[in-house]
Design a protein with these regions (language model features):
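Peripheral, non-catalytic segments flanking oxidoreductase cores
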Residues: 1-326
Length: 326
């Protein structure tokens, strides 16, 4: 299995740089988003205490007995937030594939607050549905909220980098993400004490749905793979001190297929690398405002690349994608 070296982008250097530096980093970002749709963001400015507190709290939560975690289950199939136990989701289904369910457990939460202007019943019932917050460990809500807010801020900064990478005004995306309907997911891939079913993975091959994903993989963890243009799979190793960023289907659509929403998966541990080891990660799925109309970006249209897509509304688009996996 080949290892893919994800392009590393220094966010602080971009934000603090002069015109030439910003242009150079923007160009490298554009090239990476066209080639793989994956980059690693370093010097991101997220407080390490917030990261450590989130890691520790999520590990404590997943270490609880299953009977305790199930008290915070999603209330019914198709509900977006809460605890989902092992084999409760099949990500490959979102791409039309039929596989056994994924070997992972998750906790999912949505926006921390509901904007005053939101009145759409579908939005309130889906993206702004209440999260069944765990009472154990006691630090859960505080750790989760701090991390979510940090990711929302980081996503806004990355979207400004993306704007310049697409030859747009720095603040082009701001109006689309003023009240994002982003979700946060903590993932635990338990030790594998029994052989998986044929075709069963820790996370089946899929692409993400929104504008971008901010992934924090466990230090020195293995198993994340991305699909190359030739169809082969390449392993992606964590970059110390960095967040892994990948593009979602909505961004591919927004950019008229200029940028890639890359298929990725989490494979099972090899026998030679301790199948009993767990793997954990934290993923923030950034999604524009519920009612944002996503039309092809002007700089991604020319005589050789006419617009391929009709406009879609961000929220209903996300809702249809999510419900295909349940």
């Amino acid at each position: 299995m080949a290892t893919n070296e994800v392009p590393v982008i220094d966010l602080a250097a971009f934000e603090q740089g002069d015109h030439a530096i910003r242009a150079e980093i923007s160009q490298r970002t554009d090239e990476a988003c066209q080639l793989t749709g994956f980059i690693a963001i370093t010097h991101h400015g997220v407080d390490q205490h917030i990261i450590d507190n989130m890691w520790n709290t999520m590990q404590e939560f997943f270490d609880l007995p299953t009977s305790v975690k199930q008290k915070f289950n999603v209330p019914f199939p198709g509900y977006p937030y809460g605890y989902m136990g092992n084999e409760a989701e099949t990500l490959a289904a979102s791409r039309g594939s039929t596989t056994p369910p994924d070997l992972k457990e998750t906790f999912n939460g949505g926006p921390i607050s509901i904007p005053s202007h939101i009145s759409d019943p579908e939005a309130l019932a889906f993206c702004y549905a209440s999260t069944p917050w765990p009472s154990q460990p006691e630090t859960f809500v505080q750790a989760w909220t701090s991390y979510y807010n940090a990711m929302e801020n980081l996503a806004s900064r990355i979207m400004r980098l993306f704007a310049e990478a697409l030859s747009l005004n720095t603040h082009y995306f701001d109006e689309y993400i003023s009240s994002p309907i982003s979700a946060l997911r903590a993932l635990n891939y338990p030790p594998q004490q029994f052989a998986p079913q044929p075709g069963q993975l820790r996370a089946g091959a899929h692409s993400d749905y929104g504008s971008l994903t901010i992934l924090l993989p466990q230090h020195d963890s293995r198993g994340l793979e991305i699909q190359s243009l030739d169809g082969s799979w390449q392993e992606v190793d964590p970059v110390p001190g960095a967040f892994i960023i990948n593009l979602g289907d909505l961004m591919e659509r927004w950019t008229n297929n200029r940028w890639r929403s890359t298929m990725h998966r989490v494979v099972n541990p090899e026998l030679a690398h301790d199948p009993l080891s767990r793997r954990q990660s934290i993923a923030y799925f950034h999604q524009p405002n519920w009612d944002a109309s996503i039309s092809t970006i002007p700089t991604c249209i020319d005589s050789s690349a006419p617009a391929h897509y009709e406009p879609v509304l961000s929220g209903p688009y996300l809702m249809s994608k999510f419900r295909s996996t349940i």
